[in-house]
Regions:
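Short amphipathic alpha-helical coupling elements at transmembrane boundaries
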Residues: 43-46, 164-169, 180, 224-228, ...
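Membrane-water interface segments at the C-terminal ends of transmembrane alpha-helices
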Residues: 4-35, 45-156, 189-205, 212, ...
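Short cytosolic juxtamembrane segments of multi-pass membrane proteins
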Residues: 264-276, 457, 500-511
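Short helix-to-coil transition segments within interhelical loops
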Residues: 156-161, 165-186, 408-429
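Helix-loop-helix hairpin linking two adjacent transmembrane segments in secondary transporters
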Residues: 226-243, 247
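Flexible interhelical linker loops that connect adjacent transmembrane helices
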Residues: 258-288
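Glycine-rich helix-loop "coupling/hinge" segments at transmembrane-helix boundaries
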Residues: 204-233, 446-476
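Peri-membrane helix termini and adjoining interfacial loops of integral membrane proteins
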Residues: 30-40, 112-123, 214-221, 265-270, ...
Length: 511
């Protein structure tokens, strides 16, 4: 590629990334500006809903984070390594592919008043959940699959397996191996995954509306309600509540760091003392239970769904927005990986490491400034801020695994950088690109706040309709919306898998 054209492409890439990530700046300004006034803080803390909302947020987030970590560690200790671990990892997508709203809807249809459990066992229906315990437990089950998925990539290293075999052969228990080997080895990946889980659990709105306490709701929901009101004072309180979510995230990070440091000091040295092996039944049970929850979710929604009442407009909007957002993200990321900066850019990961509510507020500020609110384009643009980092999470490791010897051979043949990109790297990236496309589509399908806020309620999707119906209405209609929200990503995943398999037969080197 000629140098002027290369510079033009790099400039265009940076401009596109700046447009997508621009909401980070007004999001920061939205949080900082009201925080400079003591009167605004006094108005926030004087609100009678704040203490209970804050308590419910802390309880649900703590249960979600600790529960997901505990489930993941129990499964790893019981199964890794071995054929059972491989089977569990192969079945993990059964739960990972389920959108959070669909998973929460199935839990609502089982445990809520008027649900299946209430119909058959009314005396076992849980009482009013003011602390968000049910929300936390649901998130713990769902996020444990994500945590296992992250850790499975780290645990695939051959070095760890060899060291574990040595410790096992010396007679040390699995929990001793966990303390001495596994946790220190996966610490960095575990820390990033836990940060993403805590940030998402703190700021989740759609699932909290479905399962969380209603009056008062969690802090994220009440902040969302304040921000969407026309009163400037209420919007200021919403901005401060969003800042409070950021402060809570910082507190969780500090607490996690202190707990990690304290735990490391208590680890005994490898001194030859063998501790008796603990029962592995809980881990084996959880490993069997986790994938089945995804299957049960699909079966339950399929049984209860009233297919005659599907909202075709919501279905079409979800499909088109998801396809467009995933395609734009895939194109930009492949070009970014080739012609972008070679060093890792940490700011690309901020949307999945920070609470979503302030970022959506920043998007809305920019949309108002450009008179784009209420448009289809603004909704797709809003989705890109979360679609891109999740797709990059899939693409970047595969890109780094490309054999440099192939590039060197192409260069010795006199191929240009553009020709190497299109004829060498893109074919090698086909399968990861298809997987990333399916992941990006599912992330776009699940977006609730950007769709509702940037679209001004004009573009109903399966997610927004499911959340709206969860507050009351027919269980059949609710199940139908959630089922289609679940089926669309599954269909895209199946299609991408078929395309990858077909290409593998056509081009033997891609098998």
């Amino acid at each position: 590629m000629a140098t002027p054209l290369q510079y033009a492409l790099i400039f265009l890439l940076w401009a596109m990334m700046a447009v997508i990530y621009a909401p980070l700046i007004p999001a920061a300004l939205t949080l900082i500006s009201p925080a400079l006034s003591l009167t605004h803080w006094q108005a926030l803390f004087a609100d009678p809903q704040l203490p209970q909302a804050l308590l419910a947020t802390l309880v649900s987030t703590t249960i979600a984070a600790v529960g997901a970590l505990l489930i993941a560690l129990l499964v790893i200790v019981a199964l890794w390594p071995g054929p059972k671990w491989q089977r569990m990892c192969a079945r993990l997508p059964w739960l990972l592919a389920i959108p959070h709203v669909a998973f929460a809807t199935s839990a609502l249809l089982i445990f809520a008043d008027g649900g299946l459990l209430y119909d058959y066992f009314p005396y076992f229906t849980p009482p009013m959940d003011k602390l968000g315990i049910g929300l936390g437990l649901t998130l713990a089950v769902k996020e444990s699959a994500f945590l296992l998925w992250i850790l499975a990539a780290v645990l695939s290293e051959k070095r760890l397996l060899q060291q574990l075999i040595v410790l096992d052969s010396l007679g040390y228990s699995r929990w001793q191996c966990l303390n001495w080997l596994l946790l220190p080895s996966v610490a960095s990946a575990l820390a990033m995954a836990m940060l993403a889980i805590v940030a998402w659990s703190l700021s989740v709105v759609d699932v909290a509306i479905i399962l969380g306490p209603g009056n008062p709701p969690t802090l994220a929901v009440i902040s969302w309600q304040w921000l969407t009101q026309g009163d400037a004072d209420q919007q200021t309180k919403g901005a401060l509540a969003s800042l409070l979510l950021m402060l809570l995230l910082a507190a969780y990070v500090l607490l996690g760091y202190l707990l990690w440091r304290g735990w490391r000091r208590t680890i005994p040295r490898v001194d030859g003392v063998r501790k008796p092996a603990t029962p592995l039944l809980p881990g084996n049970t959880l490993a069997s239970f986790l994938p089945l929850t995804g299957v049960l979710c699909v079966v339950l929604l399929a049984i209860l769904a009233d297919q005659s009442t599907i909202n075709s407009e919501a279905l079409i909007n979800s499909l088109t927005m998801g396809l467009v957002a995933a395609f734009i993200s895939l194109l930009l990321l492949l070009l970014w990986l080739e012609w972008g900066p070679q060093r890792r850019q940490l700011w690309l990961w901020l949307p999945i490491l920070l609470p979503a509510l302030p970022l959506v507020a920043g998007q809305y500020t920019l949309a108002l400034w450009q008179n784009l609110d209420g448009s289809w384009t603004a909704v797709v643009w809003g989705h890109l801020l979360w679609v891109m980092p999740w797709m990059l999470f899939i693409l970047q490791p595969a890109w780094q695994r490309i054999d440099s010897r192939l590039i060197l051979i192409a260069q010795t043949l006199g191929w240009s950088r553009a020709k190497i990109f299109f004829y060498v790297k893109c074919p090698l990236m086909l399968r990861p690109a298809l997987i990333a496309f399916a992941v990006g589509f599912s992330v776009s399908i699940a977006q609730y706040m950007p769709t509702l806020w940037l679209g001004a309620g004009r573009f109903p999707t399966l997610t927004t309709e499911a959340v709206a119906l969860s507050s009351g209405g027919s269980n059949g209609i609710l199940a139908a919306q959630a089922l289609w929200q679940l089926l669309l990503p599954l269909i895209i995943f199946a299609l991408t898998a078929l395309v990858a398999k077909w290409v593998g037969y056509v081009r033997q080197g891609l098998r």
